[in-house]
Structure formats: structure tokens, C-alpha cells
Amino acid sequence: MNIFFFIPSLEKGGIERSLSRISRKLIELGWDVTLLTNELSIEGKSYFEDSIKIIKVETPFENKKFLLFQLLNNFLLFIKFRKIINNHKPKFVLAAKNFPLAIMLKKFSKNKFKLILREAVDPYVAANTQRNFILERIILFLKKKLYPKSDRIIAISQGVKDSLVNKLSIDAKMINVVYNPAADEKIIDLSLEITDDYSFKNYTIVNIGRLTRQKDHLTLLKAFKLVIKETKCNLLIIGEGSERQNIENYIRNNDLENYVKLLGYKSNPWKYLSRSNLFVLSSIWEGFGNVIVESMLLGIPVISSRCKSGPAEILDNGKYGNLYDIYDHNKLSELILHEISSKELENSSNIAKKRSKDFSIDKITESYIKSFEELLT
């Protein structure tokens, strides 16, 4: 069976990591997998093994921000991608980004493939981050009209599906919930690598993710400021992004330089995660929350915001880790202090490891294959 993974912009991130794991397993099972892209970063390519075929289409308008150039770029991509699809004749196309272009390809390609859209974020929450009411309405209108033109939608959490059904009026029967394959056993081996730029002398809280407004590091820092008034510990933040300056300013203005370390982007964050005592996710919203599962796989306790959509589902509403309401730094500080003083680490660690198996590559890929095969009956 042949399938195209349609990712016009292949960068470093959760989408790429998840799809690389699924593609690897599909190839093991005998599937013919091809990755179709327009922008291919070194980091993005590094997620995928040599066994997967990658077709990169060149256009003269790559990385252009002006609207006219973006429209021209999409038109050229449509022409070139359509030719490739007609020549290769994939049975399925799984689109992870640029859904309008994917739907246009389905409508106007000679090869009649089955189109699956992989929705990784609550579309309503994502639209609201635009900070432009008119643009928000346009995005939601387009999604409401275009999504039903696909053959199947894979939502990476129940919360994402609920939003698609309740807010965009999409038929629930065409949506399957399939979580991310975040419990990759390779992480365990990578976690054993030596760390030479940080010593874990004190109790260490770790946060891993892009430094963006979505990740809400300021709430974490406010909570941490309260925590260090009560006990000695450190905060390790791994990631890079547009909010770095604001985070650095807060650390400096609140005299936290001796307690907080920003390590920047790390290709192997798991070697730091495995040596930490606690992982905290402070996001305002998430599609899923891969790093929560990765923490559980490594036996690291988790505290997460109760944000839309994935974290509370992963933690089963607090059964496998503590939750707090977004922006509530006081509650977060209480939970951190409780975790630091907890005597049940070994038991909770074993329970978390067991829960992480629900997100194994084998189990999740099996669900993807089932979703594909349903379209052939």
C-alpha cells in the first residue's frame, strides 16, 4: 500500500517527530511511504530515516511573507504537487499542514486518492491566537467549509474532535481520535547520554518546549519564584523562540539568575529530562503534549496546565499527574511544593510508565492503519 505524507513545511517540531515515527513503523510493515514537501530544514529531515523517500519541490517564492508571494507559491506548489501525485498514484495522502492546498489537490488531481487530514490543534483555540477578529472568523469559516471535503479527519485528542464537532459542525463519523506515538523506546537510550553543560546537584524542575506565548513560561516562572522562597531547587528551561527576551527580562528583574537556566534548543532533550526530578508543562493550549508522555515513559513526575486539548486526557484528569488551571501560578507553586515533599515517587513513577505504553508507536500506527483501511470498505 502506498501513502504520501503531505507536509509542505518540514521543520523541527512535534508534527514532524510524530509522523517520522509512524512512517518508520509503516515501512517496517511493508508500506510504501513518500514524504512530499516544499521546505526542508536540516532539523526536520533529521527526524526521518533514510528508508523514507522524500520529494522536495522547489519554488522561487519559498519563505516569502508578502501575501501575493504566498499565493503565487501555493499556486506553483499546486501545479507541481498535482503532477507528482498523478505520476506516483498514491492510495492515500495524509496531510499534516496546508489543508486547503491538500483539498485542492484531491479535487483536481486525476489520481483519486483518499485524503486524510491530521488535525493537531483545537481549531477554535488556534484561530483565536491570531489576535485579529476578522482573520479568526475567516479561518474558522474556511475550516468549516473545507474539512468535510476530505475523506477522514484524524484528531490527535478527544478535545480536538469535540471542537471540530461542536464548534465547526463537522460530522463526528468522519473523525477518528488517534493520539500521538510519543512513547518511543528510542528515547530511553537517548536519555542515557551524558550531560556536560548542566549539573543536577539540586532538585531540578524541567520545562521543554518552544519559547513562545503559547507555552506561557511566565506563569511557570511566577510559580517558581514562590517555590524557592520555601525550598532550594532549580528550574531548567529547554527550547528556543520569540519569547526568549521577555523570559530573560523576568529572570533578571526578579533575581532568579542563580536558580533558572535557559539551555536553548537541544536535539536530545531527554538526557536532561531523565535526570530531572519533575517536569512541568505550563501551556495555554496544546494539541496533544508529547513531552508529557515522554516524561512518563522515563518515570518523571508531571504537572501540567489543564489546557485544551491533550494534557488532561494523557493524565486522565489527574490520575497520572497533577493539573492546574491555566495562568494559576499560585496553584502551580502549591503542586510543585507538594511534589518536592512527596514520598510516593517510586509508585507514581511505575504507574506513569505503564500509562505511557498506551501511546506506543505500535499501538498508534495500528490505529492509523485501521483509519486508512476503513476508507477502502
Language-model features: where?
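N-terminal strand-loop element at the rim of the active site
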Residues: 5-13, 17-21, 25-69, 160, ...
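A conserved nucleotide-sugar
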Residues: 31-32, 206, 212, 217-262, ...
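Membrane-proximal helix-turn-helix segments that form the acceptor-binding/catalytic region
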Residues: 79-83, 133-153
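Short His-centered aromatic/hydrophobic patch
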Residues: 95-101, 119
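A short, active-site helix/loop in glycosyltransferases that binds the activated sugar's phosphate group
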Residues: 104, 148-175, 182
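Aromatic "clamp/platform" in nucleotide-sugar-dependent glycosyltransferases that forms part
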Residues: 265, 284
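Short hydrophobic beta-strand element within catalytic cores of glycosyltransferases
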Residues: 301-305
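Conserved acidic donor-binding segment of nucleotide-sugar-dependent glycosyltransferases
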Residues: 317-329, 338-343
